[in-house]
Amino acid sequence: MKPKILFIMHMPPPVHGASMVGQFIHDSELVNSSFDCHYVNLSVATRLEDVGKGGWHKAKGVLKKLMEVRKAVKSVKPDLVYITPNSAGVPFYKDFMTVMMLKMMGQKVVMHFHNKGVETRQDKWLDNWMYKRYFKDVKLILLADALYEDVKKYVKREDVFVCPNAIPAISNANQVTENSDHVPHILWLTNIMKTKGIMEYLSALKILEDKGMKFQADFVGGLTKEMSGDEFDSALSMMGLNECCTYYGPKYGDDKYSFFSQADVFVLPSYTEAFPVSILEAMQFALPVVASNVGGVSAEVEDGVNGFLLGGKQPVMLNTFRPDAHEIADKILLLLSNPNLRYNMGKAGREKFEKEFTLEVFEKRMVEILSNNVKC
């Protein structure tokens, strides 16, 4: 008889990194053939702009989700519960209730973190009290070795497993070409948020334009409560970037992949990240990456090999990092000015993706980790 696992995880909608990985697990033939799998969608928000928000409607949704989880545990009687909780803020308080309920019901719990933030809250007396109970007698799956720094106060290293994110292979994504005869495209493919470094990035583009560089900056992603469409348009106008910048809104599937196909450089100057899937997508399409050295990004981008890391060699875990516009501009300028460098870095990124970040590699790692935890 196969071990029974109850997966409590985020799945679309809305679409974000954690929900995409949740969908991959849900659809995995290897995972579903290895275990007797049962699923509960942990998501309460159905729209991206509602993620992280509170309110009475959200509170009712949380209580309803708790009852759904409780019912599933009593019905399935799993050998292991896999959950993808949050690490800080209001979402953490919600997930704290779920994890503590699972423990009270005598469940063996594995927590898979797609975010970070414990270190930013561990000095708060309430959060510290909750973390001590949250992390007691559980196993953790982290996205990168560097992210252990975020939880080391509460979790022993031997209780931690590492399983990086992955994405499905796209058949037409391996076309690495040396093309220097067109205006290069710089791709931003994430939500339009100040915490993604949007203002610093626009300042960097202004620096490049003032230097006389020719480029087209493509923006693909949803607007959020951090920055409205009017605010974004106003920022472009104020910096005089309307001619070289185009906003396309959120894109999915083949529409999204077409932007990767026509891009020359991928940029993600975030204040904070865990292990962004968008970088893996860029690597698959053989794009050199310019990204902040935060969270587990250094496991994806090797500085000077398949891209450039912003902010120094040491990964930043705290949410205090701010990218420097001049550093962003310098790295992009180096890539725009050197097609051979773009080609070689993109090729290295593609090779790294094929070796470490395909869905097949992820599925095998996940099955191995879950099997080990069912037995222990």
Where is each model-derived feature located?
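Conserved donor-binding/catalytic core segment of Leloir-type glycosyltransferases
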Residues: 6-8, 177-206, 217-220
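Glycosyltransferase donor-sugar binding loop
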Residues: 41-45, 189, 216-231, 249-250
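Donor nucleotide-sugar binding/catalytic pocket of nucleotide-sugar-dependent glycosyltransferases
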Residues: 132-174
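Nucleotide-activated donor-binding/catalytic signature segment of Leloir-type glycosyltransferases, i.e.
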Residues: 230-251
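Short alpha-helical donor nucleotide-sugar binding micro-motif in glycosyltransferases
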Residues: 250-251, 258-263
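Aromatic "clamp/platform" in nucleotide-sugar-dependent glycosyltransferases that forms part
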Residues: 271
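Short hydrophobic beta-strand element within catalytic cores of glycosyltransferases
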Residues: 288-291, 301
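A short, well-ordered alpha-helix in the C-terminal region of glycosyltransferases
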Residues: 327, 334, 341-355
